[in-house]
Amino acid sequence: MTKSEKKSLNESLAQWKLFLYNPTTREFLGRTAKSWGLILLFYLVFYGFLAALFTFTMWAMLQTLNDEIPKYRDQIPSPGLMVFPKPVTALEYTFSVSDPSSYEGYIKDLKKFLKSYSLDEQKNLNKCTDGVLFEQTGPVYAACQFPDSLLEACSGTDDPDFGYSQGQPCVLVKMNRIIGLKPEGSPRIDCISKDENTAMVSTYPNQGVIDLKYFPYYGKKLHVGYLQPLVAVQVSFGSNSTKKEVTVECKIEGSKNLRNEDDRDKFLGRVAFKITARA
């Protein structure tokens, strides 16, 4: 049969069958059982070696890491500020005083978050000395009490609605945790209203003080039970104010080694949020 001639269907099937298995040479897909065994053994050894090399490399790298303290911390010299409860819209709290469902989620989140700040939950925590860094050498690291009574009108004790039902909402401001951070001076969180004619801002504890006794922080695994110091911000709109909308800006002040300005990070040591209270 010449090259130009087409093979019949039976001849093509016969050649495929012969390729799949040749009874004369006992070859399967062009290879004998010995050949298949050798090539499978080669790939088994080859990929087994790669897997072992990868496993050893990962193991060697993990030996250089500490499971309790991050190895590289020099890129986070100063903490940022966060607000709580988390707004539905980015950094904007909008609610209606006459509609409890509009702020129900905020109240629920605040109660859940502040549960660990109740005195009953802090029985095993230390009553630390005010105004002094609480440095420890381990291996057991104690945590200081932060009673919710420090938040006064925003503690949820006297007003379970945290002021939302009266149009005087409370927002919690907290510093991000940084392991080993030792603030200098007398750190505090100052909060101001961008429009003083519209609303008045109150902070709790008084003057937004962040006590040094809550520093340094030793990490989640070592510092079991640690409570972040909080500052509560309460906004009160004037009775004659027709505009129930204000922007509040909070900054870390009073400490040389805590920055509150950075062109590349607008949350470094500061945060701004907007509150809109409808009738």
Swiss-Prot record:
Membrane topology: Single-pass type II membrane protein
Keyword Transmembrane helix: yes
Family annotation (InterPro entries): Na/K_ATPase_sub_beta (IPR000402), Na/K_ATPase_sub_beta_sf (IPR038702)
Pfam name, any one: Na_K-ATPase
Residues covered by region (immunoglobulin-like): 186-279
Glycosylation site positions: 240
Keyword Lipid metabolism: no
GO molecular function: ATPase activator activity
GO cellular component term of the entry, any: apical plasma membrane
Disulfide bridge map: 128-144, 154-170, 191-250
Extracellular topological domain: 57-279
Segments traversing the membrane: 36-56
BP GO annotations: intracellular potassium ion homeostasis; intracellular sodium ion homeostasis; potassium ion import across plasma membrane; sodium ion export across plasma membrane
Subcellular localization: Apical cell membrane; Basolateral cell membrane; Melanosome
Keywords linked to the UniProt accession: Cell membrane, Disulfide bond, Glycoprotein, Ion transport, Membrane, Potassium, Potassium transport, Signal-anchor, Sodium, Sodium transport, Sodium/potassium transport, Transmembrane, Transmembrane helix, Transport
Record PANTHER family: SODIUM/POTASSIUM-DEPENDENT ATPASE BETA SUBUNIT, SODIUM_POTASSIUM-TRANSPORTING ATPASE SUBUNIT BETA-3
Domain notes: The C-terminal lobe folds into an immunoglobulin-like domain and may mediate cell adhesion properties.
Known function: This is the non-catalytic component of the active enzyme, which catalyzes the hydrolysis of ATP coupled with the exchange of Na(+) and K(+) ions across the plasma membrane. The exact function of the beta-3 subunit is not known.
Family indicated by similarity: Belongs to the X(+)/potassium ATPases subunit beta family.
Protein name (Swiss-Prot/TrEMBL): Sodium/potassium-transporting ATPase subunit beta-3
Organism the protein comes from: Cavia porcellus
Gene name of this polypeptide: ATP1B3
